[in-house]
Amino acid sequence: MSRIGLKTIEVPDSVTVTKEGDNITVKGPKGELTRYFDPKITFEQNDGEINFSRSSESDKALHGTERANLASMIEGVLNGYKKTLKLIGVGYRAQAQGNKITLNVGYSHPVVLTAPEGVSVKATSATDVEVEGVSKQDVGQFAAEIRAVRPPEPYKGKGIRYVDEYVRRKEGKTGK
């Protein structure tokens, strides 16, 4: 049994959820999200609550997944999502201009990344980067792309990491 799929979702008054064909649209104070919703899973909306049901037992995993996706869409249009990254290393800098971020992280050239639509990026300081948006998927994906430019290395800890990330450190070679 899908325990997550059986949980109801509370929909606040400021959020509207509509289904048109196989797409589901969620509108809220921060924005609007549209996504494909599998027709094998049905949902009923009553008095600010959404309940999900599936057509067959083989759709258990899909049941929980679609419920979790809709819950994250509602959370996104209500509060938004934010990921913060930190650049650690001598001379590592970040500069944001509009929806582009320029990273100087030890390469011979600056690395320029463009944020996808619906995602904003800003450099709060020379070594801190914030990625914000309404889509959990887009925010997480763009933050992962920034981190992939220079992932943290285990010997000195240099690189780009999430603020809450723990980097396991290794010992260097022991000299004679």
UniProtKB/Swiss-Prot annotation:
Molecular-function GO term, any one: rRNA binding
Transmembrane regions: none
GO CC annotations on file: cytosolic large ribosomal subunit
Keywords recorded for this protein, A-Z: Ribonucleoprotein, Ribosomal protein, RNA-binding, rRNA-binding
GO BP, one annotated term: cytoplasmic translation
A Pfam family assignment: Ribosomal_L6
Cross-referenced SUPFAM superfamilies: Ribosomal protein L6
UniProt xrefs under InterPro entries: Ribosomal_uL6-like, Ribosomal_uL6-like_a/b-dom_sf, Ribosomal_uL6_a/b-dom, Ribosomal_uL6_bac-type, Ribosomal_uL6_CS
Function, in words: This protein binds to the 23S rRNA, and is important in its secondary structure. It is located near the subunit interface in the base of the L7/L12 stalk, and near the tRNA binding site of the peptidyltransferase center.
HAMAP family: Ribosomal_uL6_B
Family (UniProt): Belongs to the universal ribosomal protein uL6 family.
Self-association and partners: Part of the 50S ribosomal subunit.
Protein name as annotated: Large ribosomal subunit protein uL6
Primary gene name: rplF
